[in-house]
Amino acid sequence: MIREPEFREYNPGQLEEKIEAFWKENNTYEKVKKLRENGPKYYFLDGPPYVSGAIHLGTAWNKIIKDMIIRFRSMQGYNVRRQPGFDMHGLPIEVKVEQALKLKNKREIETKIGVDNFIKKCKEFALNNLKIMTEQFKQLGVWMDWDNPYMTIKNEYIESGWFTLKRAWEKGLLEKDKRVLHWCPRCQTALAEHEVRGEYKMRKDPSIYVKFPIEWKEKEYLLIWTTTPWTLPANLAVAAHPEYEYAKVKVETENGEEYWIMAKALVERVLSEVGVKGEIVETFKGEELEGIRYTHVLLEEYPAQKEFREKYEWAHRVILGEHVTLEDGTGLVHTAPGHGEEDFEVGQRYGLPVYSPVDDAGRYTEGKWKGVYVKDADPEIIEYLKEKGYLVKAGEIEHKYPHCWRCKTPLIFRATDQWFLKVSKVKDQIIKENDEKVTWYPEWVKVRYDNGVMNSGDWVISRQRYWGIPLPIWESEDGEYYVVGSFEELVKLAVAIEVNGERIDLPEGYEEKLKIIEEKLGPEDLHRPYVDAFIIKVNGKEMKRVKDVVDVWFDSGIASWASLDYPRNKELFEKLWPADFIVEGEDQVTKWFYSQQAASVIAFDTVPYRAVAMHGYVLDEKGDKMSKSLGNIIRPEEVVQKEGRDPFRFYMLWATNPWENLRFSWKGLEQVKRMLNILWNVYVLSATYMSLDNFNPTKVNPEELPFREEDRWILSRVNSLIGEVTDGIETFRLTRATRGIYNFVVEDLSRWYIRLIRKRMWVEGDDPDKLAAYYTVWKVFDVLLRLMAPFTPYIAEEIYQNLIRPFVGVESVHMLDWPEADEKAIDEELEKEMEYARKIVEAGSSARQKARIKLRYPVRRIIIETEDETVKKAVERINRILRDQLNAKEVVVGKVERELIIKPNFAKVGPEFKGDAKKVIAWISEHGRELYEKGEMDVEIEGKTFHITREHVTIEEKLPDFFVAEEFDGGRVFVDKTLTRELLAEGLAREFVRRIQEMRKRLDLDVNDRIVVTIETTDENRELLQENLDYIMRETRAVEVRFEEAKGYVVEWPEVQAKIGIEKV
């Protein structure tokens, strides 16, 4: 049976701890899974958060969205795969471990601590953070298989990566190549394009103009501009655009007259910037510059440049390239094929060498600045150019520059040998598969994604690091390669292992090999240095592993099959794959969403997920990014502790459309908490009365109950709400769902329906009208709690346990089926009419306030003036509610006669009639009503004809003195403010009832407690009150009302000139 609520006040923290204990004690999560194990499969793929440590509001938002969708699909009957994932390899962890071990650089990993120990420390760090994050996610009420997460560090997962790379190799989509890439000199590894997006930060760099002497031309120079002086040692050409117009400019310098060549369009700006005067003496197309040779400005300091000059025809010449722009610089581009992507491409066309005299740490390997870090060499190079007379102007520029996404070091462009997935060969297929098979939420993101794929290059997947999936590529001494696809294949191909520099040959038998491998290397661990020990033989050649590891974005890119342990577990893969749904933040559009499709099309020729949703970022209330420097970081645990899990969860799904940025607001969160408090108060009120009456919804026949219009209306609304919430979740318009629930709870249920039925709950005995109200409230909660369960699982569970479970038997609200709308219960016309009724009540209340008539005092009549047929039907159909809520004896549709006051419109008459305006005004003052009725008239005044219309008058309505009016959307409400003795008596009775009820509340009397009321008041009040004594006694649960000296608990009420006493019987 229904019990009185345990908590009278809504306390999220207290309630949520109670429910957590309930779930734990009853093993509810496992029972929910067991219940749905035979349902249709739903493969939800958790995008693995990086195990960097504590979660932030963005991570919390992400997991709250996921948990809500998982709970929703489970209630729909699906057998949901809800395995959480964690991204556990990569540079971020390496950097943290290096800092903890006080290692200064990459070299010290091998010389001070050793690769084996470093890997162990990385693993410890990752697993420790996994535990921390798991507990934080649990604190958000997230139900996932926390005891069985997929981890990118597991052997099965790594083997899935090897399988994928083997497929790429077999398809000719895995290649080694020399390219110019972003390079982190601190981490000493290449970075892929997608790792650099979003990592451009403002910094100051040199901005220099340099003149390259043209050979065989005295005092003629090619003028270039660069922000990377450190790349000048690697300069091999100067690029010009073939179609641009260039100019030879005569300039006056300290050294006398010189001729500089630059783009004609930039002459004025460049001369202004460098501070010299000049004039154009000749112009020509860029293509005419091709082949002009110049003297390298650092020729004497870099011997290799002399060799290039002799060996390569196009070294130190002007070459042509359409990448040259007129946006900045001089229109002539210093070209170093070893340090720029476009430089590399154009250099390849002209057969130039890829020269990069810079090592992994960003230090020069030769020449004048050998051993110097390149950025440290900038000022020295500038000074050298100045001394040699090649520097035209040196300054500074503040611009966006790429930084390492983990250690924040400025990156450099550097040519290195790397391994690439040839995504360029399959990107058309990626786009085709995506467009045909993937549903995007919101839909417009698909276009953005396709554009990103179209513009993407090949994926550099090799990293010169340690903590990652080892690249499964073995190399022979003569440069032949082989890609291993599994641990089993590795063991079969292995002929020896190296342990501490000692070679140990292996027998031929597989089991015998395994025994020795485990004895010498320990249990299987497909990380470095374990896999580095294997020497394999292919085609008669012994091979050792390439030392690189795989880009960490590849780890998460294979998650949809690697988390299923494919190819080891083919059965699970065939049952579940591809994923039904994924959802991540906006930054993942060009990262995880892309890496998955790229890897999947390479491995399986199709996409790995059916539907994908994108959400925004969490910002502070002002729209600023949260950061330590701004001091505006808000931690999820802080929110949970202060406001509770349910308010936090609902707020994050209510505050904004999920694809937009969410500006976190404590005020907004408080607003949501108030809504849940309102829900709780409705529950407490309902459960209290139902428990007192031992209400049992299974013992009543709803077909025999006398449901009122308001009952049918709220049942219609809650069934309509099912559609709103379901559609909102399924189309990822989550605010449609949450705001629908919010408005229903606050406006429909609390402010309107409970307001309408409160008196029905007070009736004694098994009154059918009261039972109809009880049953309606119970039915509404039965639906509403199921709709709210995915959003606010705790409060939904608590209310369900007391109000619903005793009669349906199901152990948890989360084990119920998702509600289906009862179409027969939906009455759209009634919903529209009730909406108008509420507007009429609001307008009528406003009119009463104008007239200063309290709502407790009835009015004689209210007239609704409208032309809207729906409003008319509402007044007729819901008349009882309107009378009750407006405290009016009569509410009717009709017309109110009012006097029209017609005056001249001086603003119109004056400008139009000018000197005759006074005559026209006088005429309108006398004949205004006739003009109003006819609309327009031609009139003769003093022998002159004037055309006068309604525009020339203003019309004011004057109501009878006993009416006050207010407009609403659909018409006007007129309140008759005439007060009769009968109306005064009824109003005064209501005033006294309110005060007696307040006194009962102060004494904390139970609703069923009976009282005796004594009243000291004026003779006039006594006479008026005696006309409604039965009403006063019924409403206050009084057995007697006596007019005598107030006794018992006494309160003086000056505003009604009375002392009232109450005593419990």
From Swiss-Prot:
Alphabetical GO biological process terms: isoleucyl-tRNA aminoacylation
Gene Ontology molecular function, alphabetical: aminoacyl-tRNA deacylase activity; ATP binding; isoleucine-tRNA ligase activity; tRNA binding; zinc ion binding
Motif mapping: 'KMSKS' region: 625-629
Chain location of the short sequence motif 'HIGH' region per the record: 49-59
Reaction(s) catalysed (UniProt annotation): tRNA(Ile) + L-isoleucine + ATP = L-isoleucyl-tRNA(Ile) + AMP + diphosphate
Sites where the protein binds ATP: K628
Compartments in which it is found: Cytoplasm
Domain writeup: IleRS has two distinct active sites: one for aminoacylation and one for editing. The misactivated valine is translocated from the active site to the editing site, which sterically excludes the correctly activated isoleucine. The single editing site contains two valyl binding pockets, one specific for each substrate (Val-AMP or Val-tRNA(Ile)).
Subunit structure: Monomer.
Function noted in UniProt: Catalyzes the attachment of isoleucine to tRNA(Ile). As IleRS can inadvertently accommodate and process structurally similar amino acids such as valine, to avoid such errors it has two additional distinct tRNA(Ile)-dependent editing activities. One activity is designated as 'pretransfer' editing and involves the hydrolysis of activated Val-AMP. The other activity is designated 'posttransfer' editing and involves deacylation of mischarged Val-tRNA(Ile).
HAMAP family: Ile_tRNA_synth_type2
Protein name listed in UniProt: Isoleucine--tRNA ligase
Organism: Thermococcus kodakarensis (strain ATCC BAA-918 / JCM 12380 / KOD1) (Pyrococcus kodakaraensis (strain KOD1))
Lineage: Archaea, Methanobacteriati, Methanobacteriota, Thermococci, Thermococcales
